[in-house]
Amino acid sequence: EDPYKIWISEIMLQQTQVKTVIPYFETFTSKFPNIESLAKTSLDDVLSLWSGLGYYSRAKNIHKTAIILEKDFNCSLPDTLEDLMTLPGIGFSTAGAILSLGFKKPGVILDGNVKRVLLRMSGNKSPMNQYKTEKSLKEFAKILLPGTKHKQYSQGLMDLGATICKPKNPECMKCPIVTDCCAKEKNIQNEIPVKRNEKEKKEKRIEWVLIKTKTKVLLKRNKNSGICQNLWLLPDKGFLSLDKIKNLDPVEKNFPSFVHHLSHKKLLISLNIYTIKNKDRLSINRNLYNWVNISDSVNMGVPKPVREILNKI
């Protein structure tokens, strides 16, 4: 019932399965039990705990919002839709979850489970993720809001979608609102929701180099914009100029190439591994690169494919 924890869980659950989120949520809220502790920490600390969860803009927005809440809202989440939606990363549905579950006020939640219930109730065969569909669902959900027991209503609707009104083979005869379901009446419950045709993922080739001593590995801070902004990556192949490579010893057995899937891209990743006896012989820009203890590197803010590599070296 803590609005802070509702907020963190709702952000983590965007595009991510519950079973994946649970350990991250527990670790995150243990390290940052309240808004004040989150606002006072560094973005690096936030990203390190988020590492592997993906969609890193969520973590950056959480940190930005915590700082705003400390400065302008006395370290508390506001309890109005208008104020909540001014905060980075908090949209209509997340604000609705905070209001109904955290403050027990009227609030519309439109997560995937709730959308599916509402689409079937209304017999709506529009593609689920279209803007026009979202808009009509928002209005329909507002009409259905009860006058009291807002938390119980929202939680019940989410649970209904998760356990009974499932994506495939919904258990309609167990549903408490089956008599109000337009899709069941027309026997089209298995045809809803309709999803837009997904575009084929674009492929992107990434060639990394891993340079290590016996105890340290070289990482690069990604200053570029995009999903990995401010995270630590491995240097790319272009780092290896002639004057650098002469100080390195290639490792004969290199890491096998592998594929990492993002929501919109397929990353084809190859890796060459080098060792160096004396790291001081390698000229680096210390604003971008840093030698890190191998044992510490997996706990830094690194994206999932980098973490997988570091766990295996």
Positions of the model-derived regions?
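Catalytic cores of DNA base-excision repair glycosylases
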Residues: 1-171, 177-190, 248
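Intrinsically disordered, low-complexity, charged terminal extensions of DNA damage-control enzymes
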Residues: 159-313
